[in-house]
Design a protein with these regions (language model features):
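Low-complexity "stalk/linker" and mucin-like segments enriched in Ser/Thr/Pro/Ala/Gly
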Residues: 43-62, 147-148
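Glycine-centered loop-to-beta-strand initiation motif
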Residues: 59-68, 164-166
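Short, aromatic- and glycine-rich surface loops/edge beta-strands on solvent-exposed regions
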Residues: 76-88
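Small/polar beta-strand repeat architecture
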Residues: 103-132, 137-193
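Extracellular acidic loop/turn motifs
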Residues: 28-33, 47-48, 145-146
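Edge beta-strands of extracellular beta-sandwich domains
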Residues: 89-102
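Short, hydrophobic beta-strand segments
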Residues: 66-77
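Beta-strand-rich structural segments
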Residues: 2-34, 39-41, 134-137, 193-194
Length: 194
């Protein structure tokens, strides 16, 4: 996987799921400046800093703004520090994140998937729009898993058919299939409505 703006759609980082952040770069005078040879490192729960799996992508014509997608392994903690350094140009930028641990409503293995959907197995109760507003996180198989959960994706469920086909927003970076394992997570924005 690579940097993808699709992982910036959630209102907060979910523990052990990919998450994209914007990175501003300012020079010594406080003016926006594009970075030269970015070098981004992270620390989980006050551990030693290590190189991020991805590197900052500078937005064309951005005047000092880039973005980076942290892996699920890089968000697998209570507090995450990200330091975006450069070979020359702007000063280092520091960002802190507090990934949320959300209650698991149900877990399973998908029976199918597509760019913007995941189909629940028949063993999971499904009612029209019941899961709307909940968060789904992939945990293994295609579109999930990897070392430390590096490839896990999290999305908001925007629709649920009576047949158990969940619509998600935004579309998946890597489309799930019948090998994809998942957790459906509750949060204060989800009420199990019908």
């Amino acid at each position: 996987m690579a940097n993808s703006t699709s992982h910036a759609a959630l209102p907060f980082p979910v523990k052990n799921a990919r998450f994209t952040i914007l990175v501003p770069y300012l020079d010594a005078d406080g003016d926006p400046t594009d970075p030269t040879t970015p070098d981004t490192e992270f620390s989980v729960d006050a551990g030693a800093f290590a190189d991020c799996a991805e590197e900052v992508t500078t937005i064309s014509g951005s005047n000092g703004v880039g973005y980076i997608t942290l892996t699920g392994a890089e968000t697998n903690g209570s507090m995450v520090a990200v330091v975006a350094k450069v070979a020359s140009g702007p000063k280092a930028t520091i960002t802190t994140l507090y990934p949320r641990v959300l209650p698991i409503i149900v877990s399973g293995t998908a029976s199918a998937g597509a760019a913007g959907t995941l189909t629940l197995p028949s063993t999971i109760f499904s009612r029209l729009n019941y899961f709307n507003g909940a968060i789904i996180r992939t945990t293994g198989g295609t579109g999930g898993g990897g070392t430390g959960g590096a490839n896990n994706q999290a999305r908001i469920i925007t629709g649920c058919t009576a047949a158990g086909v969940l619509s998600v927003s935004p579309n998946w970076e890597t489309t799930p299939d019948n090998t994809t394992t998942f957790d459906i997570l509750g949060w204060e924005g989800w009420h199990g409505q019908t």
